[in-house]
A protein has these predicted regions:
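Small-residue-biased structural context
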Residues: 1-233
Length: 233
């Protein structure tokens, strides 16, 4: 049996992504603060660590739906992030933003916190697009070169950023900003709960925002806890 008390929360989720649901339940941040050991993360979240461990140990066995990303080749995992997560942000983000703008026009006067959510999400998309560009144009191409050099047993080309740790530290800092931003959105929306007078579109945009945040959590988890550590090794 694993000693979860000596594992980071990022490692625990990397072992089985279904554990993410348990951490979400207790407010434990596994993506932006995945390097924290479980005792520390539990204390920060005000969670009973023993109860958390009990739920992890009683979780249903891994199924085919729980992909073992940490066993994937690094370049394949980067491909997955690009084709699934980056594409989702670029396509779903503007659609959610458009619907959110509509909801603000109709319901903003009665529910003024919507304007704060609108501003936060707008800033998020703007910053995320710049963030994705940096990964796609700078960091990920070099990771592909690293994998290629290792497979072909050839010298690694010089990186114009110096060391790969430099852009990775920038990406992780930007992940922290997004994590805090979506914690604020979740608070403003009462955990993405629609008010009683909400129309169907209002309820829909909250569902979409929640799904967007959950996908972003997995995106950040894959990079912070798997791709980046493996790239630095």
């Amino acid at each position: 049996m694993k000693n979860y008390k000596r594992m980071t929360v990022g490692e625990i989720v990397a072992d089985n992504f279904n554990n993410a649901g348990i951490f979400d339940k207790y407010g434990i941040d596994f993506c932006c603060h995945g390097s924290a050991l479980l005792p520390e993360a539990s204390k920060t979240a005000g969670a009973d660590m023993e109860k958390v461990i009990e739920e992890i140990e009683h979780l249903a066995p891994t199924t085919s739906e729980n992909i073992d990303f940490k066993s994937w080749p690094l370049d394949l995992l980067v491909d997955y992030i690009l084709k699934i997560h980056h594409r989702n942000i670029r396509t779903q983000g503007p659609e959610i933003e458009e619907l959110l703008d509509k909801i603000c026009r109709v319901h903003g006067e009665k529910h003024p916190s919507l304007y704060n959510v609108q501003a936060l999400f707008h800033d998020s998309l703007s910053d995320l697009n710049a963030h994705l560009d940096k990964e796609e144009l700078v960091l990920f191409p070099y990771i592909y070169e690293m994998v290629k050099a290792k497979l072909e047993n050839t010298p690694l080309p010089e990186f114009h950023c110096g060391s790969i740790e430099a852009p990775i530290s920038v990406m992780m800092a930007e992940h922290d900003i997004e994590g805090e931003r979506y914690r604020h959105i979740e608070h403003l929306t009462n955990g993405y709960t629609a008010p009683e007078d909400a129309c169907n579109s209002y309820r829909l945009v909250l569902q979409q925002l929640k799904a967007f945040e959950e996908a972003l959590h997995q995106h950040i988890h894959l990079e912070n806890n798997i791709v980046f550590p493996h790239s630095i090794k």
